[in-house]
Amino acid sequence: MVDARDGNALDRAVGDLDGVVAVPGDVSDPDHRRRLIEAAAGWIDLLVNNASVLGPSPQPVLADYPLEELRRVYEINVVAPLALVQLALPRLADGARVVNVTSDAAVEAYETWGGYGSSKAALAQITAVLGAENAGLRFYALDPGDMRTQMQQEAFPGEDISDRPPPEESVPGLLALIEGNLASGLYRARELVEATA
């Protein structure tokens, strides 16, 4: 089961994949989150929280950050992933994995990245605490690294980001968490890829 805000893009992404249920919607909507968990039949083996929002573009310094926009960033980047985990916990199979996608901005103090970065730091801490509280499950915070995405372009308006790697280069790192037996914790996709090469 997969979701995205853009139903058309979601349908294109799912394509002809067998057994994949597309549930379009916004993870900041509690009703949509409930529909997502209900659409997952039986036990849940994997939950990947990848939905994210950058915030204003260009990103302002924290002294000028619009607080309503910061609340929106936290609602999508922090509250929604935790809410999905809360709904999924009773149905997570023993040994199930939860991957929360974070960022290097969660651990590095980049100028103007305070809103997004602090939300990803909060998500990483929530992931660590969930791992400590649920010994039979694996909770991973995954930093995919810089990628050539729309969000990256929004973060650097007017700049050429063609030198960033495409998102698919981070996939082996994600697969290492999903298929491996690593302890709960914070991981960087590039390091996981290098370790498995």
Model-derived segments and their meaning:
Residues S103:
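Residue(s) in the substrate-gating loop at a strand-loop-helix junction
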Residues N50-P58:
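Conserved NAD(P)H cofactor-binding loop of Rossmann-fold oxidoreductase domains
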Residues L137, A141-P144, T149, P157-A197:
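C-terminal helical subdomain
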Residues P58-L62, P66-R71:
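Substrate-binding pocket helix/loop in short-chain dehydrogenase/reductase
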Residues V85, S119:
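Active-site helix of classical SDR
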Residues M1-R12:
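Conserved glycine-rich Rossmann-like NAD(P)H-binding loop of the short-chain dehydrogenase/reductase
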Residues D6-N8, V23-R35, L67:
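The beta1-alpha1 cofactor-binding region of Rossmann-like NAD(H)/NADP(H)-dependent oxidoreductases
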